[in-house]
A protein has these predicted regions:
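Rossmann-fold NAD(P) dinucleotide-binding segment
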Residues: 51-112
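Rossmann-fold dinucleotide-binding core
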Residues: 4, 93-150
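Short amphipathic alpha-helical segments
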Residues: 17-19, 41, 73-76, 100-104, ...
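Active-site-adjacent beta-strand anchor residues
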Residues: 30, 64, 92, 134-135
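Short gly/ser/thr-rich secondary-structure transition/capping motifs
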Residues: 42-48, 72-73, 113-116
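NAD(P)+-binding Rossmann beta1-loop-alpha1 motif at the extreme N-terminus of oxidoreductases
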Residues: 1-63, 122
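A general structural motif
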Residues: 1, 84-85, 129
């Protein structure tokens, strides 16, 4: 996969995105507090001005934000600019009904979705030892498995 996006650079997302950059992935990142993206820029990531700009250049977008509503708002901002077939991977801890709703909503627009919450806390995120619980199509999982292993 040529270009990946990462949305949400908090306690969990920042180290997760950092591992992607460290493993050689071409990462474009965004955070609602722009200063949180600066350390990632220094590692070699591109920082997008907004979610639309991120979605326009990425084949897969990983989200790690706080709540169902945050995921929904991010998806609303990204889908108009994203290419058909873009794969959205949500690492946020969302409700099962929200995850199903995101999948349905994205599928209807020609996008793909994996629900992939993580466990292991901030220590696991920094160490690169998180456990992921991935729900979605096996084919989509196989596409991003090498990225998730980073």
């Amino acid at each position: 996969m040529a270009k990946v996006g990462f949305v949400g650079l908090g306690v969990m997302g920042a180290p997760m995105a950092g591992h992607l950059v460290a493993h050689g992935h071409d990462v474009t990142a965004w955070n609602r507090t722009p200063s949180k993206a600066e350390p990632l820029r220094q590692l070699g990531a591109t920082v997008a001005a907004d979610l639309s700009a991120l979605a326009a250049v990425c084949e897969a977008v990983f989200l790690c934000v706080a709540r169902d509503e945050d995921v929904s708002q991010c998806l609303d901002a990204m889908t108009p600019a994203a290419s058909p077939g873009t794969l959205f991977v949500d690492h946020s801890t969302t409700s099962p009904s929200a995850a199903l709703g995101f999948h349905q909503r994205l599928s209807e627009k020609g996008f793909r979705f994996l629900d992939a919450p993580v466990t292991g806390g901030s220590m696991g995120a920094r160490a690169g030892t998180l456990t992921l619980f991935v729900g979605g199509s096996k084919a989509d999982f196989e596409v991003v498995a090498p990225i998730l292993q980073s």
